[in-house]
Swiss-Prot record:
Protein name, UniProt field: Probable sugar efflux transporter
GO cellular component, one term: plasma membrane
Membrane topology annotation: Multi-pass membrane protein
Record bears the keyword Transmembrane helix: yes
Keyword annotations: Cell inner membrane, Cell membrane, Membrane, Sugar transport, Transmembrane, Transmembrane helix, Transport
Family classification: Belongs to the major facilitator superfamily. SotB (TC 2.A.1.2) family.
Alphabetized Pfam families for the sequence: MFS_1 (PF07690)
Protein localization: Cell inner membrane
Amino acid sequence: MTINPVSRKVAWLRVVTLAIAAFIFNTTEFVPVGLLSDIAESFHMQTAQVGIMLTIYAWVVAVMSLPFMLLTSQMERRKLLIYLFVLFIASHVLSFLAWNFTVLVISRIGIAFAHAIFWSITASLAIRLAPAGKRAQALSLIATGTALAMVLGLPIGRVVGQYFGWRTTFFAIGMGALITLLCLIKLLPKLPSEHSGSLKSLPLLFRRPALISLYVLTVVVVTAHYTAYSYIEPFVQNVAGLSANFATVLLLILGGAGIIGSLVFGKLGNRHASSLVSIAIALLVVCLLLLLPAADSEAHLAILSIFWGIAIMVIGLGMQVKVLALAPDATDVAMALFSGIFNIGIGAGALVGNQVSLHWSMSAIGYIGAIPACAALVWAVLISRKWPVTLEEQPH
């Protein structure tokens, strides 16, 4: 460890600032889900056409995570964070100014570049910066920042977009990032790269069947979730025939349930992670199958969203903990791969939802999403039986 001993208060401040950064990065990835209709209206496009922006963003992150991580593997981490935040902020200013849809997509690609690097180093940085014996809590704090992006970031971003225009949402995120950057500059010491891995560690990781199986499970289950979730805002308004305000409330409920999922996993994850993930995937299958039937009332959709939010948070946390446990010798490479694979799933799900909405009916997004969700459930049960001991390992 190259960090000088510091007080627990300062150590926690560093981790909290990193968690706030995680909140901001996740908010900007997810916030277009709540703004699709507004963006489409301003550029005179169909909502589903604008939705392709979600796929482009996610796939840029997927493709660039590993190359960027390797390119920056020897770079001092504090300096790297400053550079990626500058790119992140500048790209949000361009989003605010975007004079056509193409410029907006270009700005989102810039944000995706910053995102790709950020998520490949965040988990390992949180572990390094945490007070002694508090590594698991530090990771949990980063996960909470991620959860809050769905609980608060996405709905608040949508409310700001409704009342002040979607451009203001992106500008506000950029300003939040600027404040966070100033805090990081003030708080962080120099952080030489360590345990970053290199291309040499790739064959080693790919020779771990339990890890590869987790990656496959991740892409399939994330595709299932985002097939429906990417278009939940227009689904609520156009299929269920409910108000724009209720769409905001529903996003708030779904995100808030994620906090419950985080608490459940924090309580039971150490001993029963594999079982929890399988149960959560089964719950996701049920939620997707019931999405259209639940569209007959606000109450039914609200109840469904609670279970959906709990399920996806448990799945996400379970996958991340397992990846870190199975690759303690190359955390940055393993997490860069995980981030890339997760985003392949986001992009694939958003694209499937896009095609279903354009060429079939938006009402079918739940049923179509349930197909890969069922496949994921079978795969989750199979791998938990094949590697029951390995998959229960936890990072120490």
